[in-house]
């Protein structure tokens, strides 16, 4: 189960310790239900290829991820998807309460480029209880879109590549 809240933001946060950075490319075989491939390249580290399935939902939804090899990723990208993949840079920051803030810059340089941030939680109750103010992020995380239709990466794919 994936339990996360999402906010639209305007850049990288200031004053938080950077844990890691990934350069990603992702594409969708299907938007409903979500069937996605993703290439995740850790800055200074390894590259992973992931096939992901997600159920419908906002705050909480089922998610199944499986590692795939590069050859299968390329075949799915070229022969099944056949469209330019979404490019993302993701930076992860450890928050004072121990949670991790993931900030994403999507399709940098394109007219449709945007930023968003997510925090994942162990339970729905923890997600509903968590407040950005508690970590000094009230000004940064002030535009929550967790349960708003059209705010998923799948919706962005459909709008820009569909």
Language model features by range: what are they?
Residues 1-162:
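Phosphate-end processing signature that detects enzymes handling 5′-triphosphorylated RNA
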């Amino acid at each position: 189960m994936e339990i996360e809240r999402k906010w639209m933001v305007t850049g990288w946060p200031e004053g938080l310790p950077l844990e890691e950075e990934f350069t990603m490319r992702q594409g969708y075989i299907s938007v409903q239900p979500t069937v996605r491939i993703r290439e995740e390249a850790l800055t200074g580290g390894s590259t992973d290829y992931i096939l992901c399935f997600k159920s419908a939902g906002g705050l909480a939804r089922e998610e199944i991820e499986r590692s795939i090899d590069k050859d299968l990723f390329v075949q799915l990208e070229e022969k099944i998807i056949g469209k330019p993949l979404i490019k993302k840079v993701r930076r992860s920051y450890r928050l004072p309460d121990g949670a991790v803030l993931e900030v994403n810059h999507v399709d940098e340089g394109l007219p449709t480029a945007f930023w968003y941030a997510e925090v994942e939680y162990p339970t729905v109750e923890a997600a509903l209880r968590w407040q950005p103010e508690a970590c000094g992020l009230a000004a940064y995380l002030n535009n929550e879109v967790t349960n708003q239709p059209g705010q998923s990466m799948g919706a962005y794919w459909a709008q820009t590549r569909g």
